[in-house]
């Protein structure tokens, strides 16, 4: 692990001294991932100067680790022939992603300049959504027939893997029409007799991905089965490519990032994470505004609730002091519940079949926590205002609101799931609005009842 900022400062010193030979040696000595971190901290002109000092193979490795906007920027700034060679050195799926982020004219120009076989394979990948198995797969994999012997397979691997630069994870077995029949691990090959036929040792119980599977499905399958790669098939079970574990990790990271954004009411949709962080102000507004309208409408309803109980506020202005306390604690426990359920639904630990059990469980937990904090708030208010009745009202409201918040926080994601709406996107704004509206209504209703009872007792005493 290197200190990125210290390294960047050193690079700038070397650039200032114009000792490029020394800098070239140092840059090529870094791991591609570290080099990508360094490049993200450099200014555009510094990036270009440093990039021209890196070997082409190292440059291609580093490009994979850069965010899309920087990939396009760097390749657009360097010589076109050099950029084409670097793209050719990328894995097919990475090349498809990079070219897909460019302007259409630039994409076509590069595809026309690349070797025909490579260009055709990349074009095919670009036909698929980059977040599906078709867009993430690589067409480079090892395939054999079931009638081959172990010795024939091993000889074939030695020849083919080096020739096509294939990263070898598993060997796949197909028929003459490319239908996927089975899979072989390297361990099985190395521990079997040379004369054994593939059909006798292959695993026909295949875990596979469909070409249209989205990244959440891909991540779930990899997490469940822990394979280094998975085959990708079309609707006719033709083997089309493989998705490797590192690509699945990238998909999982993107999925997690999207869920985090969604839980805050940021609708990514077709907008990339990099566009939200580094793109135009309008792009960021477009991602963040939609669900704020839901919150706006909900809070206007909450304002109307306060207005309905205006007479209570005038008679007991002190109740307004406790509104932030009630809203804050109810909001927090609601957020806790919603986070647990949304994450559980995402990972498969929670299913819609267990909905009732989780609703009852979270509601009970919310009630218990609410009762605990309700007692604390009652005692605090009694000690502070010397008014037990007021403290009791605030405490009861606290217990009810926290139980309601936990219930809403649990019920909302399940409801969204049933309606085929992403629970992560909608749940945050919905629960915030619902908790505020219902919480205020419960609180003011209790306060009004307390005020009415107080007035009734006062009249009886006067009479």
Where are each of the predicted segments found?
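Cytosolic juxtamembrane regulatory segments of multi-pass membrane proteins
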Residues: 209, 434-441
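Mid-bilayer segments of alpha-helical transmembrane spans in multi-pass integral membrane proteins
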Residues: 106, 121, 402-403, 407, ...
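Conserved small/polar residues in nucleotide/adenosyl-binding loops
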Residues: 454-461
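Alpha-helical transmembrane segments and their membrane-interface boundaries
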Residues: 256-407, 411-425, 429, 433, ...
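Gly/Ser/Thr-rich beta-alpha loop segments that engage phosphate groups in nucleotides
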Residues: 184, 243, 330-336, 460
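Hydrophobic packing positions in regular secondary-structure scaffolds
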Residues: 1-270
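Membrane-interface junctions
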Residues: 17, 44, 56, 80, ...
